[in-house]
């Protein structure tokens, strides 16, 4: 059974907590489907080419129908001309969204957690809170404190997951390139797969791993 590593307030290992046994039997295909759904939903539908009705020009017949020895032509907007319209080109009314079931979303997230736990890259801490130092009625050194937390983990990049995240903690991590902090309500399988390590608050971890099969 896979386990998440429990860290103390100094981010040193002090124990472990088991993931639900049902996670072991989840198929990896659920994660593939969710990542495909996530990326397709984020795709901007901007590709657009003009057809022969949309290009400018073509108001008159380019040359006489007969007698010139050339193939007949009615308009320079025809796709056979350089600068003419495009046949079967891209349109900007295509919907790239791919449907995925609610159950598959949950299974994908659970599989991603299982993968992180097997790789010893899933960590649980009691609380993720950055308070900084109050100077002149302003909170300062927020990013410095957040960076110290990240450096103490000794990981390549890290996803931090909070339960009811406060504005100072969110602000503290916003300028760190190799970190991302999200509230548990925003957590998804794509984010779990995108980062090499994950640090979760204990409350957020319990919220995610609770049995939701009856919902």
Curated annotation (Swiss-Prot):
Residues 46-72 are annotated as: Disordered. The keyword Ribosomal protein applies. GO terms for molecular function: rRNA binding; structural constituent of ribosome. Residues 56-71 have a biased composition (Gly residues). SUPFAM superfamilies: Ribosomal protein L4. It comes from the Bacteria. Transmembrane segments: none annotated. Keywords: Ribonucleoprotein, Ribosomal protein, RNA-binding, rRNA-binding. GO terms for biological process: translation. Signal peptide: none annotated. InterPro entries: Ribosomal_uL4, Ribosomal_uL4-like, Ribosomal_uL4_dom_sf. Pfam families: Ribosomal_L4 (PF00573). GO terms for cellular component: ribonucleoprotein complex; ribosome. One of the primary rRNA binding proteins, this protein initially binds near the 5'-end of the 23S rRNA. It is important during the early stages of 50S assembly. It makes multiple contacts with different domains of the 23S rRNA in the assembled 50S subunit and ribosome. Part of the 50S ribosomal subunit. Belongs to the universal ribosomal protein uL4 family. This is Large ribosomal subunit protein uL4. It comes from Helicobacter pylori (strain ATCC 700392 / 26695) (Campylobacter pylori).
